[in-house]
Amino acid sequence: MRVVLGLLLLTFIYLFYSHAKYSNTGIDITDEAFHYFLLQSSKPGLPFIVYGNLFGPIINLLDLEIAEIRMLSLTTHLLCGLLLAIAVKPKISKTNNYWSPIYTIFITFTPLILYGIQGRFISYNSLTFCLTSFIISCLIFSSVHRNQIKSYSLVFISALLTGIQFGVKFPTFIILFILIILTILFCFRLTNLIVFLLGTFIGIITVHKNFNIFQIFNDCKASLGEYGFAGFHGSESFLDLYLNSLYVQFLQAFTKLDIIIVICTMLYIKRTYILNSIIVTFLFCYLLFRSWHCSYFQSGESAFFCATPWFLAAISVITLAFYYHFKRIIIFKRNEVFFLIILFCSPFLCSLGTNTSLIKQFPVYLTFTSALIVILLCKMPKTKGSFLLPLYLLIITICVNYNSIYQNPVRTYPLDQISNEPRNSHAGNIRLDDSDDQIISNILSYIDLNSKPGSYLPYIDLAGTPGTYLFINKERDFPYYGQWLDITSTSRLERLFSDLKKSSKTKIFIHCRQDWSLEKFGSFESSKKIMGSNLMVGLFALKQ
């Protein structure tokens, strides 16, 4: 165990060293650019309002640049995972002594998936995760505190954060709000409910800067209809998009029954015979082999599909927990059941509120699933394979994000593999050492081609990517991001691109590619067809 912990510590140190080394290299001109340029919508109710109202002024005041924000984001993600682990530990320690340091590291490191497969900034996905992690942690801390003043204070903090969540993802807020209300009604004093309702109201009006709660709800409802039902992925509604993608995720999980059987067997072996130790080690190696064979160990965009091992692990652990509960070997208290339900639902409810399918959103919130798995493992009788399951999932976490966390500043191929020569893609690369006229001409051409019905070309500015807005000298009006640019955002934009051009001679270019990585996982037919293979990313990369 000490050897394992030592290796994980070295991995953690190397993570920060390597990330700091390239944190000032390149920028993703899609999601990351949106947050770096502090874009704000003039329309109320959109899910970006929290970032603009709360974090924009802080970034402006401190004049944080891309490197500082990236490192701050990495630290924030890991601290939120650590907080959840710290909150879960005392709750578990009251009933057993099975807590292992590997569990703390496991929960702490899983936010790397969220950080690794999106823009490196604290995006609204990150805000959703951080807020939900803090909310659940505060509620768990409150449930173990006997001091009423501390308990009320923790409930009030969770309520404030829930109100802020209202301005990040409205559907997530609704379901989370209902789950917390039910938890308080059945597991806390009734006075906690009053504290929670008051704190939530204060959180909502703080973010929206509006005391008219009914107007706020109307704005969110209107923006949800406009923003969500845009026909992305071939779906006409959130419900159609979510249910069909969820069906695919579960279908992928249940087609790998051998892994479920292996996990259940590994967790059931209790004896310390040498033969049993050999069997458990063999099963652990089999899990790693199957994960490699099933293409779980991916990088970049393919890392979206790293959720399958967590599905399989959660299914296995929950099944065994029910078995032990039925045999009266373990007993679940009422408040434990509610917290387990919240942790189980959190990856799903945090995924709601965007026009992205659950099959892509679920993996970024696996920290909650990791906490669920750890709690159930600690409740069940200790076995030879108890700590190996989190270790297995932790290895997958590092492997699927190795490329993006340790080597790349943005979501593209490793920088040492990218050249100025066009790659085998529909678009190739747009080199910044070309003439300005040639760059503008190429970008406009790709925009026109991608705007045609049925196009599968990599997009540069389908929704108004800020980087494109600068390159084409603001010659076009863009439907979303472009029209949100103000003096502050354009000055940050121009300063960044100017600095990057000065620091490199001929190695700066826009790398554009069509991502067909989803094809290997298949597609399916339903009332609507979700075209997973049309994921397109335009990236601005600096090769050193």
Where are these regions (language model features)?
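Short periplasmic/luminal acceptor-recognition loop of GT-C membrane glycosyltransferases, typified by
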Residues: 170, 399-486, 506-514
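Membrane-lumen/periplasm interface segments of specific transmembrane helices
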Residues: 192-271, 289-295
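Aromatic- and kink-enriched transmembrane "portal" helix at the membrane-lumen/periplasm boundary
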Residues: 66, 70, 95-97, 107-129, ...
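Aromatic/acidic, Gly/Pro-rich catalytic loop(s) in extracytoplasmic/lumenal soluble domains
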Residues: 504-544
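Specific aromatic-rich, kink-prone transmembrane helix
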Residues: 127-147, 154-162, 369-372
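Membrane-interface alpha helices of multi-pass inner-membrane proteins
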Residues: 152-170, 176-182, 199-204, 343-354
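Extracytoplasmic catalytic/substrate-binding loops of multi-pass membrane glycan-assembly enzymes
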Residues: 20-36, 43-58, 63-67, 235
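Transmembrane-helix motifs of polytopic, lipid-linked glycan transferases
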Residues: 71-97
